[in-house]
């Protein structure tokens, strides 16, 4: 797949969980092959739902989510399915291939190295591993598929410092597309070069280019500008309302002037930029 090809496209996508919980409203964006992007937003705002839309596990109410017709997608799962806990290591990884892989042991060893996990016996059962080891095996199971789009949700949660370093090195050299959700700013800054920012209030996605820290600073500057504009509008609105009250009390033709003042105040209210709750959390990323 050529480097400049669009591998993922959202076209006027709207999705909601019930009438009162919209996630996306007419969202459009495109991701090119080889992009490494952070998906940013407030906790619980629908980032995981976005991954499910890409995987085809959820269907939008309107619009279209499309992956390049030859493209493959894999995600680092959070838990091993109950019916797979009795699988051996070899069986667990073999299920991700449609044909027998004669070099499967080497492929397994390579992806386990990427998550800093020593190669176990191939006949060891998945339920014999600790929770942290299972998390690494799940992450490795996404890597072994060598997908065109790799989706990672908090991949560093069960990794120590050395494990994060191994994974970072792997992702830097990975030539395909990576979308990642993570609160580990240093990890994100090491290999991503853009952000898809999910706005919980407008239910849209904003695209930013640059390393993680630069993008966070850009968003913070935008927020500060919006806050400053809101302060100015609040002052103007208050003045217009005070003037409207004065004119209304004088009666006669001045009541019409008072009404115009109130209408102007309402219009200014609509122009205010809503302070996003998730924006307040940006310094924590």
Regions found by a protein language model. Name each.
Residues 2-4, 8, 21, 218-285:
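Flexible nucleotide-interacting loop at or near the entrance of a catalytic core
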Residues 1-226:
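ABC ATP-binding cassette signature C-motif
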């Amino acid at each position: 797949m050529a480097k400049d090809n669009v591998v993922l496209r959202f076209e006027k996508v709207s999705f909601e969980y019930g009438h009162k919980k919209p996630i996306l409203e007419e969202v459009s964006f495109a991701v090119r092959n080889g992009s490494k992007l952070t998906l940013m937003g407030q906790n619980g705002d629908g980032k995981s739902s976005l991954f499910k839309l890409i995987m085809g596990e959820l269907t939008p109410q309107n619009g279209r989510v499309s992956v390049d017709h030859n493209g493959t997608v894999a995600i680092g799962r959070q838990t091993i399915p109950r019916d797979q806990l009795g699988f051996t290591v070899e069986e667990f990884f073999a299920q991700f291939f449609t044909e027998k892989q004669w070099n499967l042991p080497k492929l397994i060893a390579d992806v386990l190295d990427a998550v800093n996990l020593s190669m176990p016996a191939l006949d060891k059962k998945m339920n014999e591993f600790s929770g942290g080891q299972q998390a690494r095996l799940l992450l490795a199971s996404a890597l072994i598929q060598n997908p065109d789009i790799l989706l990672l949700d908090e991949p560093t949660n069960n990794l120590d410092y050395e494990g994060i370093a191994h994974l970072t090195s792997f992702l830097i050299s990975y030539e395909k597309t990576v979308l990642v959700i993570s609160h580990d700013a240093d990890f994100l800054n090491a290999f991503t070069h853009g952000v898809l920012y999910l706005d919980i209030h407008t239910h849209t996605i904003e695209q930013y280019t640059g390393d993680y820290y630069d993008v966070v600073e850009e968003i913070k500057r935008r927020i500060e500008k919006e806050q400053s504009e809101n302060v100015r509008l609040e002052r103007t609105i208050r003045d217009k309302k005070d003037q409207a009250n004065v004119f209304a009390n004088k009666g006669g033709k001045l009541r019409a002037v008072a009404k115009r003042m109130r209408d102007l105040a309402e219009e200014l209210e609509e122009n205010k930029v809503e302070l996003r709750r998730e924006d307040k959390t940006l310094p924590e990323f």
